[in-house]
Amino acid sequence: MIILSHHIEGESLLMTNFEKVKHFMQTFGQEVKTKASFSDEKTNQLRLDLISEELEELKNAMASKDLLEVADALTDILYVTYGAGHAFGINLDKCFDEVQNSNMSKLGSDGKPIYDESGKVMKGPDYFKPDLSKYLS
């Protein structure tokens, strides 16, 4: 059994951010699901409230042009989103990889990005939609 202290040198090389949040949740007695499902209403609402709170902090930080607070809010959004993933039993590492692969499939047949007039990345001929359903069973 490996016991992790509050900080381990090189920890970021050992665990993904999603796994670090799992460690936090287990340490603090929060439920970490291994199978995808909804939690009880109280937990579902907590997860939604945490994400909403951090999004509001991001809006305020951007309005006041405070990069330190933007960094804090963005990091907290990631943290509470990963926590929600664990609360719902959804492996966000695997989901992220699937979405990343899908996003990279948007390249044109020449291997270059395709943009619309506003600068939005468009879907290329080899685009495939991410299949997140395989991570929900």
Language-model features and meaning:
Residues 2-137:
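Flexible "arm" and connector segments at domain edges
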